[in-house]
Amino acid sequence: MTRTTRRLRECADRGVSVAILFVLSACGSGGNVSNSRNVAEAKNNMSGVKATEDSAATAAAPSTSVRTPVVLFFGTSLTAGLGLDPEQAFPSLIEKRAKAEGFPIRAVNGGLSGETTAGAARRIDWVLRTPADLVVIEGGANDALRGLSPDAARANLEQVIATIRQKQPRAKIVLVQMEAPPNYGPTYTRNFRTIYADIARKENVPLLPFLLDGVAGISRLNQADGVHPNPAGERIVADNLWKSLKPIVAQLDRNPGSG
């Protein structure tokens, strides 16, 4: 049992409904109230798409300069950075970290609060208007919080990968491990956890460690909702992801003639 899982179980033992906290916050407070907010958030997060497309086109033209690869972070409110300024969200932090270590990238935040994997499978086609060299997929948390079928989540995530390969066959793809809270029982939690390794094997994509490892269940690293990381927690998320992403980012094509 991981430290994160133990903390989630301790919260549940104290009478705190982890699932309810997750549903109220990670799912964008639910229902119709969040729909307009989610749409606005998506537009805000993707406001740089046109600029990215123009920059990518410029980078693709013959030049003596080094091309800057585009990394698309596609996910939920955890990717969007709900409750944080855009520059505090982990995609922006990773962009800064990559540049500081000599591997400049252009990070595009494609996070959307409250989105299930079914929504992700529908939205990915639109998001892929952004030319990307690498797509980082974070999805499934909202499925788990609602107790939705792990098999359905698996199929939806596989569809996301299939769409990326169809629309942008040159893009590299990585999948991020997500976990379910313990409220639905050990069988559901186990079945949900295993879909990610299954997808990674079937689709031959790298599987990154649990997004919130070392952050989930630790109050000082999360916002008041107890779910979404605060700036300190977000820095840990970014550090953890970068450890896995760095060797992949280092191999991205920076040839000015590509793109």
Q: Where in the sequence are the language-model features?
A:
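Bacterial N-terminal signal peptides that target proteins for export
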Residues: 2-16
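Hydrophobic helical h-region of N-terminal Sec-dependent signal peptides
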Residues: 17-21
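C-terminal motif of bacterial Sec signal peptides marking the signal peptidase cleavage site
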Residues: 23-26
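Bacterial signal peptide processing site
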Residues: 28-31
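N-terminal propeptides/low-complexity segments immediately following signal peptides
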Residues: 35-47
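Serine-esterase "nucleophile elbow" of acetyl-processing enzymes
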Residues: 45-113, 123-131
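Alpha-helical cap/lid subdomain in secreted, periplasmic
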Residues: 103, 121-259
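N-terminal helical cap/lid subdomain that shapes the substrate entry/recognition surface
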Residues: 118
